[in-house]
Amino acid sequence: MPGNQQKPESLETDSDTSPSCGLSDLSRGGSLESRCSSSRSRSFTMDDESLKHLTHEEKDVILFFEETLDSLEYDFDEPALCDSGIHCHSPQSLEESPSSHSEPEDVIDLVQPAPASGEAESLPDMPQVTGAPSDTKHGTPFLEGGKQAAENSLPPPDSRGPEVFPLPPSLPVPAPSAPRKELMSPSPPAEHPKLLRSVPTPLVIAQKISEKLAGNEALSPTSPSKEGRPGEWRTPTSPASRNGDHVGVWHRHTTQSAPKVHRFPSNISVTNSAGKDFNKTISKAAVNVQERKAQVLANINGMSFIAAGDTSSEERWQKAEEQRSGSADGARTLGRAGMAGEPGAPCAGVPARAQQSRAVQTEQPPALANGFQSVHEALRSEPSSFVPTSKTITFRPDPAVTGKLARQNASRSLYEPRPDGSQDARKRTGSLPRAVGFRPQGITVQFSGRGSTEEARREALRKLGLLKENL
């Protein structure tokens, strides 16, 4: 062929294109000469630069895309494409195309081998359907001539066989989509799915959309397709958008999901309130720890005060116990204090009335299950590791005894025995009951429902008789 002699040896795959371009130039006029020459020049430049390292198939695909782009530049005014010459021209159609240009049998011959290409979904089908009527060199009435030629080419059953019979009733289907002529023009060959690879998927989807738009304009909110005209979804789909079907079609519908957005900060506020309560419990626990440290020292010193013969503080202690007997927490803590105040051999100078009041108070709290404290109570009654310096607690005895007891408390808590403590203080601390598994007990004051203010602390300590009233 003379076309093969014009191309270099490096472009091996272009051997099929040159005869097709030559025959198409002979049959369809000189309008395609510039197009084939542009594709040749493009392929030559690519051959010199980038086609050296490409394979046989890659060169074929690149050339196919070049010719497709060349055909799209003319906007279907001169739609005889070289890609149809590459893949679709059988020798029978090549012989018939120069002889009979306007006959509908040429269209049938061009469309029938079209599925063999299979590389483009919608673009190869459009020139194959409209290839023969364009041979008359009319640029403007191309779409109308293509439709007439396609309708004329469908009825003869000799070349198509028995597959053509269900086609005539399906011809008026693409009528509603008049503005989509460039997509709907190859729709008649797209209607018979029995042909291999002859149904382009975008055309079927567009046809279904046009049918739904034509038949369901009034019932558009109930149609399952979301690709309808946006004007129909403005007013009637406000209830459907609440269900989440068409949310995001209009910005007006996205504002209806605002209650969900407002629920989320409410959840956050709930968790924040729970966190505040948790912080309150932490602060209460910290206050309880500080009060426990103060009360441990006050309890030990208070026992020594009772041993010293302070009967007025003992009377106030008894009155405070009677007032707080209704509270379960107060009864439990005072019961622990009473249990701690029951020695096997009572100290000298302790009145019998104080012993009786302590015995009464020990009967009020429920007895422990195993005779041991719970972990929580044991931790709360644990003595402090340092001597607290609280200003709200003042002690009645002289400073000498107070200093001795403070030093003794520090030595007991740090487990470092000091020999400078007096023998009386050691006898008093040794006379306290120490069961196996028990730690030295103290009074824990719980402020339930009250704040951690200074007045509440002083009032509680005043009720317990541990605070000097005339400060």
UniProtKB/Swiss-Prot annotation:
Residues 1-46, 82-247, 310-365, 383-437 are annotated as: Disordered. PANTHER family: PROLINE AND SERINE-RICH PROTEIN 2 (PTHR16095:SF9), TRANSMEMBRANE PROTEIN 143 FAMILY MEMBER (PTHR16095). The modification Phosphothreonine is found at T45. Keywords: Methylation, Phosphoprotein. The keyword Lipoprotein does not apply. This is Proline and serine-rich protein 2. The modification Asymmetric dimethylarginine is found at R263. Residues 154-177 have a biased composition (Pro residues). It comes from Mus musculus (Mouse). Residues 313-324, 415-427 have a biased composition (Basic and acidic residues). It comes from the Eukaryota. The modification Omega-N-methylarginine is found at R263, R450. Residues 354-364, 383-393 have a biased composition (Polar residues). The modification Phosphoserine is found at S43, S187, S220, S223, S431. Residues 26-43, 90-101 have a biased composition (Low complexity).
